[in-house]
């Protein structure tokens, strides 16, 4: 399946149905009075997170979503049917932005979470609603209120427990393929990975999700190479696994290059727990391995793991280290609750916050 992490979508909720102007007509009843029913509500536009999706590719082929209008009211005090809702199915981790691409509407981080993006218009009142003691036969009714329409941006930030970062050809995809069932493209040239890949790793009967993103190079925060556009996919991770290839001539400089790009990107990426590993060590002899390990330790300020996806050396140890950090981070954070939104119990204000209540029919 092709990967797409950003999409522009046009949405429109349904208009409310018009109220009816009708009078009771029955034999032997001379003044039956008004019996026009109210119009039905227009349909809403919702967004909902579902399991099994990790791309927004479906929104490349369909960008317009419109709910149906409410049915007009009818005689005999019959209220029109409400319009049908439309629901956008998105992956967990999707953020919804206004057309300016900066104003956040909602951040959907839990499976099954729903949010109303556009409320349908209320139905108009029928003439029976306007009957008074001084006006027994009103001959007017309200039209339905129009629905809402807007253009929004969907932006996906994948949900993973650990993120793999490093220079191109640092062995990130090989690591992912060796510890999970993911099958990313692997080749001996830079930027083989063009989009993020996810895999589920298992260690000591515990599972966690790994995210592999395209490699970073110097100047990535300024758009050099693929740039830093995929770093958003590791913003939600608990821990970063920073891989430095043993084939680099200067492993300390390679580490600092990626670290600088993470700092330039911001969003607290450098505040996340970091595990550093010297990868592809099968290409070194013991003397060279000792030298480069010492150089990398000096650059990162900690003892790096020594791993090889080819021979399996050090793989179990680094997976256990990742697991321990993830367990610790999860224990410190309270579990998220799926917000329960009742029908029409939220109005989106200018600040994007929900307020109880519903629009009253004029």
Swiss-Prot record:
One of its GO terms (biological process) is ribosome biogenesis. This is GTPase Obg. Keywords: Cytoplasm, GTP-binding, Hydrolase, Magnesium, Metal-binding, Nucleotide-binding. Belongs to the TRAFAC class OBG-HflX-like GTPase superfamily. OBG GTPase family. Monomer. Residues 1-159 form the Obg domain. One of its GO terms (cellular component) is cytoplasm. It comes from Rhizobium etli (strain CIAT 652). GO terms for molecular function: GTP binding; GTPase activity; magnesium ion binding. It is found in: Cytoplasm. An essential GTPase which binds GTP, GDP and possibly (p)ppGpp with moderate affinity, with high nucleotide exchange rates and a fairly low GTP hydrolysis rate. Plays a role in control of the cell cycle, stress response, ribosome biogenesis and in those bacteria that undergo differentiation, in morphogenesis control. Residues 160-327 form the OBG-type G domain. PANTHER family: DEVELOPMENTALLY REGULATED GTP-BINDING PROTEIN-RELATED (PTHR11702), MITOCHONDRIAL RIBOSOME-ASSOCIATED GTPASE 2 (PTHR11702:SF31). Its EC number is 3.6.5.-.
């Amino acid at each position: 399946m092709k990967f797409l992490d950003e999409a522009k979508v046009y949405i429109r909720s349904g208009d409310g149905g018009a109220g009816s102007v009708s009078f009771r007509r029955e034999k032997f009843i001379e003044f039956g009075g008004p019996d026009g029913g109210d119009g039905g509500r227009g349909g809403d536009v919702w967004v909902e997170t579902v399991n099994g999706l990790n791309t927004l590719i479906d929104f490349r082929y369909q960008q317009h979503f419109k709910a149906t209008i409410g049915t007009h009211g009818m005689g005999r005090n019959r209220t029109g049917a409400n319009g049908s809702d439309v629901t956008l199915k998105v992956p967990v981790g999707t953020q919804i932005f206004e057309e300016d691409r900066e104003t956040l509407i909602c951040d959907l981080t839990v499976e099954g979470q729903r949010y109303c993006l556009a409320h349908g218009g209320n139905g108009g009142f029928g003439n029976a609603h306007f009957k008074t003691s001084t006006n027994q036969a009103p001959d007017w009714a309200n039209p339905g209120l129009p629905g809402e329409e807007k253009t929004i941006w969907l932006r996906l930030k994948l949900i993973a427990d650990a993120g793999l970062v490093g220079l191109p050809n640092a062995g990130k995809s090989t690591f992912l393929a060796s510890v999970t069932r993911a099958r990313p493209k692997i080749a001996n040239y830079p930027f083989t990975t063009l989009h993020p890949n996810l895999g589920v790793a298992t260690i000591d009967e515990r599972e966690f999700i790994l995210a592999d993103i395209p490699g970073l190079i110097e100047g990535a925060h300024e758009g050099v190479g693929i740039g830093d556009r995929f770093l958003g996919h590791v913003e939600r991770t608990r821990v970063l696994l920073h891989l430095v290839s043993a084939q680099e001539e200067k492993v300390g400089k390679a580490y600092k290059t990626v670290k600088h790009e993470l700092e330039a990107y911001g969003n607290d990426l450098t505040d996340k727990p970091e595990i550093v590993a010297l990868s592809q060590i099968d290409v070194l002899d013991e003397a060279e391995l000792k030298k480069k390990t010492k150089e990398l330790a000096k650059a990162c300020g900690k003892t790096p793991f020594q791993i090889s996806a080819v021979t399996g050396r050090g793989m179990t140890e680094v997976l256990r280290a990742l697991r321990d950090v993830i367990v610790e981070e999860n224990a410190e954070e309270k579990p998220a609750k799926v917000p329960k939104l009742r029908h029409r119990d939220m109005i989106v204000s200018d600040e994007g916050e929900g307020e109880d209540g519903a629009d009253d029919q004029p």
